Amino acid sequence: MHPAPDMSLWQGRIDSQEGAGALRWHQWIRPYHESAGAASVLLGFASDEGVRRNQGRQGARQGPPALRRALANLAWHGEQALYDAGDIEAAEDLEGAQERYARRVAELLGRGHQVVGLGGGHEIAYASFSGLAHHLGRDGGTPRIGILNFDAHFDLRHAEQASSGTPFRQIAEHCEASGWPFAYCCLGVSRLSNTAALFDQAQRLGVRYLLDRQVQPWNLERSEAFLDSFLQSIEHLYLTVCLDVLPAAQAPGVSAPSAHGVEMSLVEHLVRRAKASGKLRLADIAELNPQFDNDQRTARIAARLVDALVN
């Protein structure tokens, strides 16, 4: 039995006098039902247990409802059906929640849906990838899955327990065990937020990355070419945005705010470029922490990125 979505979060302005073209997200979205045809589906991962284990600022568990509230009043410009499939709650059982989320993602992908995950800590990444891997690996082949992560951190840590700092290490181990290539691209990496040991680990694993100071307006063509080269090397794309890739002035509501970061305009541009490749299979937004947000600034940015992924 899957949890029902809280549709009371979807409230906003109604411009009935403007006609049928004046709809907003809260008027378009519907609660997910198992007989729904192919559509865009939002699935929340209400967890900050991984953040706690990673010694970060907790509060991301409230990210999914905050993101829905920020989405609710946005103008709707799409034509496809849109559903809310509710949240997978983690509490202290992170590993169990990741398994449940992965199974749900695989189910939804198997029904032809476009899934966008709403975090929650970045521990959502291992759950998302696991679901996509299960979906694509059913025929016993070797899918070339690319992971595109917008993030100030590699999240390749060694740890006894899974956390928000370990998901891509876990994915690398999953790929090694399955005999699959590990294709990981990280854009916006902060040199001062990752130790030399993590850079060495990234090199050993063949991670492609650009530093935050490289993903800048004056260097846009290089960033585009770097992304395009990665996209050409894969068949299926899993895209994840950790909101701490953005400058703290734009995204204060995260576990680890960035002193430098990558401007929102560039992140959105590159997200749209990745989506336009036609290889996007699954996406999520991670690390929204309403407890430290200011005037819903981070939630609004996250909502804009979700809209870019859906529409």
Curated annotation (Swiss-Prot):
One of its GO terms (molecular function) is formimidoylglutamase activity. PROSITE patterns: ARGINASE_2. Mn(2+) 2 binds at residues 151, 153, 242, 244. Its cofactor is Mn(2+). Mn(2+) 1 binds at residues 122, 151, 155, 242. Its EC number is 3.5.3.8. Belongs to the arginase family. Catalyzes the conversion of N-formimidoyl-L-glutamate to L-glutamate and formamide. This is Formimidoylglutamase.
